[in-house]
């Protein structure tokens, strides 16, 4: 029981107190209390930590840790927090007013609290207390109201209805910059000049007074001795307590003062009368003050020891308090430093503004001074304009005519006009020189002004740059660093993934006639760490468990793979007639079989610049839609200048074939069909069929295609930002997931296990195949349809193994169980579904395809959908062709040597 209480107390402390130093201080205070057993000191120390309303439940959590004899005193010293609301009604029109003051509001980040009551007023008379939190006024909640809105709400009605609950704390905030603090009611009243109450100081008699009940029936006596106090300290005191007696059981100790017995006051009672009262009754109700006269009965040695212990405890408590409050001091210092820094920035900005203003004033003064000097030297502007007009009037060209007329009219035998013209010329030259000098000075002045304006603009620009640099916060710098780290991580991830893919491709050896080797295992990347949210309830869309081939609604197509570009062939016609059918050899029939067979290639010759393509058409008559579907898939071979063609790249698994070597390629020989058994008649249920791998001729050398630089879409989706899925705050694979926390090392076995969180929008559109009871031995993704939630997420592709769904491991599930679990997880509530997948490495063809149902001939659309996946595929020297009923693996050599060999049919479709 004690361990359970201690564990619950620690959980509550961890939940309510975030600062580790304050937690340590709280535990040290409790440790010191169990050494000193002083409740008043304990409560005083606890109030330093429990200094917020949300931490008040710690007082109730500490109460079970207090011994029973101290719990009454503990309850008196701690604030009594009421859980129930109290409703009172006040008359707003009362002559004395409401009789209360409130503080707080939404703008201060706290509720509304009563901070002062007028003694004898309305609020005091109805039982309101200082430290009550006002919850409702006139029926309206005020949790989101400002102080002014609360005052206006009180004024709306004559009778004010108030609901309160007692907290015992009052918010304190001296200035807008200061953080909100809380004070207990007794501390607040004491600082305001009132009488301190409720703290329980050691000298206060009422706080240490307690009552004990003793029944003397069946006992020999009280088991204690009493003594009268000296003159300076009168009273009746317990001088000795026998061990194991009734007095020891009820908690009486040496030095306790007896204040009252059965209603009789012992404060001024005589010693004999006190003895008679204690002996007169067999049932006693005794009120005592613990330790009031302990010093009267202590020896000198005990006094010295107690003083030494008190000093040690005081030093220890001071040290613990100092350590506990160190974090608060550091926080205050940081706040002070931040305030000082802001003040310095503001001061520097003010100094810059003042300096800028002084510089501008100085520039304007210099301009005024220069203008005055210039006006003194050259006169006002109006006088400057006048000589210009005079020079224009005395210009010799326009005044030539009237002057000649005046000369002719005043002629008196002399020629005064010649002298007159000379004087006017001299005057015009003098004026032009004056104008040139003035224009030069004006030009110099304008240049000087222009330079000063440029300097002023440069200074303004520099000031703005400095201010902007100062205003850049540390958060923005951290965001910049974080974005750079993210970009670096994405580049590293892409580079690592490209290296893994290239290494996996380089490990594939050149093959001539043998079967393709198994795909190289890609070493999984170290999975990012994140806890898997197992019990999440998520939102839903039905999954179609019935095979799509049984109905004639438009099928959902898998998500489109990227088309690999090819240069247009000059000699390739739009449609080429069907290749000639080869004669049957051995057990192979060629006339009416839908199976394709390649003839031996011609003698190797250098590849032409453009290789003609051939269309494959079935020899058996089919509907026009099927002919069109099968006729639009040309056969092309790679050459050194072109990547792998579309037909060879688009295998059923969606991964292009590539080879690390570059060799010459030859045009393909005509392809024919080999025989196959007729499909069994029955209901149109799809069955699994496997590809027939027909071996090439013994003299045919397979030339691998040139290594394609275009990566499959699934690998691009895993590596880089693809489509719209990688927008801001989007993660394709969840971080922090540890696969070894869910699976054993044998289950992981080198797989790249990742956690995907897919948002439930629309339908999931994810098809599964395999199962623990299938040849595959695991649940894998067979198709990801366009427009579904899985395709929009982009983290799951065809071939991935499903290992867990919403925390449930499905590695040992059958296909039906896995589909049911996936449908149930999608139908549950919530917004997300969690899938744990093992990423499929680049591999050869190993998927399964559903067979063509018997109803395909009746529906051209359905037949086209089924036969689109039955195209022949060339992989590493093998020729793969899909059969409607089963999948066969044949080599041409085995056909010729062992006629009794027959392919085994595949397992039924799960």
From Swiss-Prot:
<feature type="modified residue" description="Phosphoserine">
    <location>
        <position position="219"/>
    </location>
</feature>
<dbReference type="GO" id="GO:0005903">
    <property type="term" value="C:brush border"/>
</dbReference>
<dbReference type="GO" id="GO:0030507">
    <property type="term" value="F:spectrin binding"/>
</dbReference>
<dbReference type="InterPro" id="IPR030237">
    <property type="entry name" value="Harmonin_N"/>
</dbReference>
<dbReference type="Pfam" id="PF00595">
    <property type="entry name" value="PDZ"/>
</dbReference>
<feature type="region of interest" description="Disordered">
    <location>
        <begin position="563"/>
        <end position="688"/>
    </location>
</feature>
<dbReference type="GO" id="GO:1904970">
    <property type="term" value="P:brush border assembly"/>
</dbReference>
<protein>
    <recommendedName>
        <fullName>Harmonin</fullName>
    </recommendedName>
</protein>
<dbReference type="GO" id="GO:1904106">
    <property type="term" value="P:protein localization to microvillus"/>
</dbReference>
<dbReference type="GO" id="GO:0001750">
    <property type="term" value="C:photoreceptor outer segment"/>
</dbReference>
<dbReference type="GO" id="GO:0042472">
    <property type="term" value="P:inner ear morphogenesis"/>
</dbReference>
<dbReference type="GO" id="GO:0030046">
    <property type="term" value="P:parallel actin filament bundle assembly"/>
</dbReference>
<feature type="domain" description="PDZ 3">
    <location>
        <begin position="752"/>
        <end position="839"/>
    </location>
</feature>
<comment type="subunit">
    <text>Part of the IMAC/intermicrovillar adhesion complex/intermicrovillar tip-link complex composed of ANKS4B, MYO7B, USH1C, CDHR2 and CDHR5. Part of a complex composed of USH1C, USH1G and MYO7A. Interacts with F-actin. Interacts with USH2A. Interacts with SLC4A7. Interacts (via PDZ1 domain) with the C-terminus of USHBP1. Interacts (via N-terminus and PDZ 2 domain) with CDH23. Interacts with USH1G. Interacts with MYO7B. Interacts with CDHR2 and CDHR5; may mediate their interaction with MYO7B at the microvilli tip. Interacts (via PDZ 1 domain) with ANKS4B. Interacts (via PDZ 1 domain) with DOCK4.</text>
</comment>
<keyword id="KW-0966">Cell projection</keyword>
<feature type="region of interest" description="N-terminal domain">
    <location>
        <begin position="1"/>
        <end position="86"/>
    </location>
</feature>
<feature type="region of interest" description="Disordered">
    <location>
        <begin position="890"/>
        <end position="910"/>
    </location>
</feature>
<dbReference type="GO" id="GO:0060122">
    <property type="term" value="P:inner ear receptor cell stereocilium organization"/>
</dbReference>
<keyword id="KW-0221">Differentiation</keyword>
<dbReference type="GO" id="GO:0050885">
    <property type="term" value="P:neuromuscular process controlling balance"/>
</dbReference>
<feature type="compositionally biased region" description="Pro residues">
    <location>
        <begin position="599"/>
        <end position="611"/>
    </location>
</feature>
<keyword id="KW-0597">Phosphoprotein</keyword>
<keyword id="KW-0175">Coiled coil</keyword>
<dbReference type="GO" id="GO:0001917">
    <property type="term" value="C:photoreceptor inner segment"/>
</dbReference>
<feature type="coiled-coil region">
    <location>
        <begin position="417"/>
        <end position="482"/>
    </location>
</feature>
<feature type="compositionally biased region" description="Low complexity">
    <location>
        <begin position="583"/>
        <end position="596"/>
    </location>
</feature>
<feature type="coiled-coil region">
    <location>
        <begin position="299"/>
        <end position="377"/>
    </location>
</feature>
<dbReference type="GO" id="GO:0042491">
    <property type="term" value="P:inner ear auditory receptor cell differentiation"/>
</dbReference>
<comment type="function">
    <text>Anchoring/scaffolding protein that is a part of the functional network formed by USH1C, USH1G, CDH23 and MYO7A that mediates mechanotransduction in cochlear hair cells. Required for normal development and maintenance of cochlear hair cell bundles. As part of the intermicrovillar adhesion complex/IMAC plays a role in brush border differentiation, controlling microvilli organization and length. Probably plays a central regulatory role in the assembly of the complex, recruiting CDHR2, CDHR5 and MYO7B to the microvilli tips.</text>
</comment>
<dbReference type="GO" id="GO:0032532">
    <property type="term" value="P:regulation of microvillus length"/>
</dbReference>
<keyword id="KW-0677">Repeat</keyword>
<dbReference type="GO" id="GO:0005886">
    <property type="term" value="C:plasma membrane"/>
</dbReference>
<feature type="region of interest" description="Mediates interaction with MYO7B">
    <location>
        <begin position="194"/>
        <end position="833"/>
    </location>
</feature>
<keyword id="KW-0206">Cytoskeleton</keyword>
<dbReference type="GO" id="GO:0032420">
    <property type="term" value="C:stereocilium"/>
</dbReference>
<feature type="compositionally biased region" description="Low complexity">
    <location>
        <begin position="899"/>
        <end position="910"/>
    </location>
</feature>
<feature type="compositionally biased region" description="Polar residues">
    <location>
        <begin position="650"/>
        <end position="664"/>
    </location>
</feature>
<dbReference type="GO" id="GO:0005902">
    <property type="term" value="C:microvillus"/>
</dbReference>
<feature type="domain" description="PDZ 2">
    <location>
        <begin position="211"/>
        <end position="295"/>
    </location>
</feature>
<dbReference type="GO" id="GO:0051017">
    <property type="term" value="P:actin filament bundle assembly"/>
</dbReference>
<feature type="domain" description="PDZ 1">
    <location>
        <begin position="87"/>
        <end position="171"/>
    </location>
</feature>
<feature type="compositionally biased region" description="Pro residues">
    <location>
        <begin position="564"/>
        <end position="582"/>
    </location>
</feature>
């Amino acid at each position: 029981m004690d361990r359970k209480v201690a564990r619950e107390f620690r959980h509550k402390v961890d939940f309510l107190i975030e600062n580790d130093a304050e937690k340590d201080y709280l535990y040290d205070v409790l440790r010191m209390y169990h050494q000193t057993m002083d409740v008043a000191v304990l409560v005083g120390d606890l109030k330093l930590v429990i200094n917020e309303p949300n931490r008040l439940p710690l007082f109730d959590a500490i109460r079970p840790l207090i011994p029973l004899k101290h719990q009454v005193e503990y309850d008196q010293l701690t604030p009594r927090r009421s859980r129930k609301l109290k409703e009172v009604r006040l008359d707003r029109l009362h002559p004395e007013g409401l009789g209360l003051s409130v503080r707080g509001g939404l703008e201060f980040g706290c509720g509304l609290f009563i901070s002062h009551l007028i003694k004898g007023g309305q609020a005091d008379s109805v039982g309101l207390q200082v430290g009550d939190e006002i919850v409702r006024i006139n029926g309206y909640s005020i949790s989101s109201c400002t102080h002014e809105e609360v005052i206006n709400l009180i004024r709306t009605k004559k009778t004010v209805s108030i609901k309160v609950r007692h907290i015992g704390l009052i918010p304190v905030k001296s200035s807008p910059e200061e953080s909100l603090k809380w004070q207990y009611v007794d501390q607040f009243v004491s600082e305001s000049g009132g009488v301190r109450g409720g703290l329980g100081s050691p000298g206060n008699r009422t706080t240490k007074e307690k009552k004990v009940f003793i029944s003397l029936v069946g006992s020999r006596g009280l088991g204690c001795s009493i003594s009268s106090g000296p003159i300076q300290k009168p009273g009746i005191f317990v001088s000795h307590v026998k061990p194991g007696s009734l007095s020891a059981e009820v908690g009486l100790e040496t030095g306790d003062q007896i204040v009252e017995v059965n209603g009789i006051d012992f404060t001024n009672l005589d010693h004999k009368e006190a003895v008679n009262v204690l002996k007169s009754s067999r049932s006693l109700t005794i009120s005592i003050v613990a330790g009031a006269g302990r010093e009267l009965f202590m020896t000198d040695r005990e006094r010295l020891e107690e003083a030494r212990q008190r000093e040690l405890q005081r030093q220890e408590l001071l040290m613990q308090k100092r350590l506990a409050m160190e974090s608060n001091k550091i926080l205050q210092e940081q706040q002070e430093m931040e305030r000082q820094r802001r003040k310095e920035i503001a001061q520097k900005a003010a100094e810059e503004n003042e300096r800028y203003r002084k510089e501008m004033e100085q520039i304007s003064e210099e301009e005024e001074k220069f203008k005055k000097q210039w006006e003194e030297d050259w006169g006002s502007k109006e006088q400057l304009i006048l000589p210009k007009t005079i020079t224009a009037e005395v210009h010799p060209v326009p005044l030539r005519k009237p002057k000649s007329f005046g000369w002719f009219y005043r002629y008196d035998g002399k020629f005064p006009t010649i002298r007159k013209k000379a004087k006017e010329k001299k005057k015009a030259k003098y004026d032009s020189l004056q104008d040139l000098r003035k224009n030069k000075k004006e030009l110099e002045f304008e240049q000087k002004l222009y330079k000063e304006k440029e300097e002023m603009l440069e200074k303004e620009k520099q000031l703005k740059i400095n201010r902007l640099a100062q205003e850049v916060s540390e958060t923005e710098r951290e965001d910049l660093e974080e974005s750079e780290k993210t970009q670096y991580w994405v580049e590293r991830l892409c580079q690592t993934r490209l290296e893994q893919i290239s290494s996996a491709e380089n490990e594939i050896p050149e093959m001539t006639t043998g079967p393709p080797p198994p795909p190289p295992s890609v070493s999984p990347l170290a999975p990012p760490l994140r806890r898997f949210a197992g019990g999440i309830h998520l939102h839903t869309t039905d999954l179609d468990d019935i095979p799509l081939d049984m109905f004639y609604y438009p099928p959902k197509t898998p998500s489109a793979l990227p088309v690999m570009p090819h240069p247009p062939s000059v000699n390739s016609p739009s449609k080429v007639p069907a290749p000639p059918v080869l004669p049957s050899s051995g057990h192979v029939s060629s006339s009416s079989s839908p199976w394709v067979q390649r003839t031996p290639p011609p003698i190797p010759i250098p590849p032409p610049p453009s290789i003609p393509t051939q269309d494959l058409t079935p020899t058996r008559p089919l509907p026009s839609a099927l002919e069109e579907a099968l006729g639009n898939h040309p056969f092309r071979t790679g050459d050194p200048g072109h990547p792998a063609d579309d037909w060879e790249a688009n295998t059923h698994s969606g991964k292009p074939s590539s080879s690390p070597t570059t060799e010459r390629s030859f045009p393909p020989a005509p392809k024919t069909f080999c025989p196959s058994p007729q499909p069994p008649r029955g209901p149109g249920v799809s069955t699994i069929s496997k590809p027939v791998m027909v071996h090439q001729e013994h003299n045919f050398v397979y030339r691998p295609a040139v290594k394609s630089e275009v990566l499959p879409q699934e690998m691009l989706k895993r590596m880089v930002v693809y489509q719209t899925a990688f927008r801001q705050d989007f993660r394709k694979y969840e971080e922090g997931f540890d696969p070894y926390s869910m699976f054993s090392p044998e289950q992981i076995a080198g797989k790249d296990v990742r956690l995907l969180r897919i948002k439930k929008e629309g339908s999931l559109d994810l098809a599964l195949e395999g199962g623990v009871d299938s040849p595959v031995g695991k649940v894998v993704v067979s198709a990801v349809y366009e427009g579904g939630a899985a395709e929009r997420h982009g983290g799951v592709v065809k071939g991935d193994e499903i290992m867990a769904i919403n925390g449930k491991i499905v590695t040992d599930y059958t296909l039906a169980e896995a589909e049911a679990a996936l449908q149930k997880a999608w139908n549950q509530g919530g917004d997300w579904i969690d899938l744990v997948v093992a990423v499929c490495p680049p591999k050869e063809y190993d998927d399964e395809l559903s067979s063509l149902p018997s109803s395909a001939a009746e529906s051209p659309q359905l037949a086209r959908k089924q036969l689109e996946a039955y195209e022949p595929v060339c992989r590493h020297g093998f020729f793969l062709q899909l059969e409607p009923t089963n999948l066969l693996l044949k080599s041409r050599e085995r056909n010729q040597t062992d006629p009794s060999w027959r392919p085994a049919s595949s397992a039924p479709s799960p």
